[in-house]
Amino acid sequence: MKRIVIIDYGLGNLRSVQKGLEHAGASPAISGNPEEILAADGIILPGVGAFIDAMKCLVPLKKTIAEFAESGKPMLGICLGQQVLMSSSEEGRLTDGLDLIQGRVLRFPKSELKVPQMGWNNIRVKQDHPLFKGIPDGSFVYFVHSYYVDTAAENTLASCEYGLEYAASVVNSKGNVMGTQFHPEKSGATGLKILRNFVEMC
């Protein structure tokens, strides 16, 4: 069985992601050990909270995560885990991210829409990629976030409309580093299919 490691860096609802992967047919481990991370067939970077706190917690693992990404093996960031894959964030103060995918994390502009975006919204699939195999355009997934990813079209796997169009899912140029702003582990059958697709990529 493929070895998938959920990275434990002090932030994130690890158990819900673990349960989601188990429902997708995997037996994931939770670890913050660099050797275990590098030995994995695939890794998941979860995250709930503030960008600046996440980057502080990730300092001991930055080199490990960069090395894993360079290896070409699949990596998936979820929610805040997608945001930290980017170059920078304006949350709190301008803070550098892991810079595995070029782009910025920005606050939703003031509008009549409530921030954070919390609940179900539909996504538009923008690229033919294994992560979205069998996912119909317009599928609904579950979001909870106040900041969004602004990145180039070639890095956008799926988009979402919430006052503006933003990257609901991202990918690097190699195709192995991916992120979802939504929570696949909370997105019903659609999210389960996305997690299964990730497991199949590993």
Curated annotation (Swiss-Prot):
Keyword Glycoprotein belongs to the record: no
Keywords, in A-Z order: Amino-acid biosynthesis, Cytoplasm, Glutamine amidotransferase, Histidine biosynthesis, Hydrolase, Lyase
InterPro entries in the record: Class_I_gatase-like, GATASE, Imidazole-glycPsynth_HisH
Official protein name in the record: Imidazole glycerol phosphate synthase subunit HisH
Subcellular location: Cytoplasm
Biological process, per Gene Ontology: L-histidine biosynthetic process
One Pfam family here: GATase
Pathway stated in the Swiss-Prot or TrEMBL entry: Amino-acid biosynthesis; L-histidine biosynthesis; L-histidine from 5-phospho-alpha-D-ribose 1-diphosphate: step 5/9
PROSITE patterns tied to this protein: GATASE_TYPE_1
CDD domains the record matches: GATase1_IGP_Synthase
Catalytic reaction(s) noted: 5-[(5-phospho-1-deoxy-D-ribulos-1-ylimino)methylamino]-1-(5-phospho-beta-D-ribosyl)imidazole-4-carboxamide + L-glutamine = D-erythro-1-(imidazol-4-yl)glycerol 3-phosphate + 5-amino-1-(5-phospho-beta-D-ribosyl)imidazole-4-carboxamide + L-glutamate + H(+); L-glutamine + H2O = L-glutamate + NH4(+)
Main subcellular location of this protein, as a coarse class: cytoplasm
Claim: Lyase is one of the keywords in the record: yes
Species in which this protein is naturally found: Methanosarcina mazei (strain ATCC BAA-159 / DSM 3647 / Goe1 / Go1 / JCM 11833 / OCM 88)
GO cellular component, one term: cytoplasm
EC code: 4.3.2.10, 3.5.1.2
Active site positions, chain numbering: C79 (nucleophile), H183, E185
PANTHER family assigned: IMIDAZOLE GLYCEROL PHOSPHATE SYNTHASE SUBUNIT HISH
One Gene Ontology MF term: lyase activity
HAMAP family per the UniProt record, alphabetical: HisH
Quaternary structure annotation from Swiss-Prot or TrEMBL: Heterodimer of HisH and HisF.
Start and end residues of each Glutamine amidotransferase type-1 domain: 3-202
Disulfide bonds: none
Reported function: IGPS catalyzes the conversion of PRFAR and glutamine to IGP, AICAR and glutamate. The HisH subunit catalyzes the hydrolysis of glutamine to glutamate and ammonia as part of the synthesis of IGP and AICAR. The resulting ammonia molecule is channeled to the active site of HisF.
Coiled coil: none
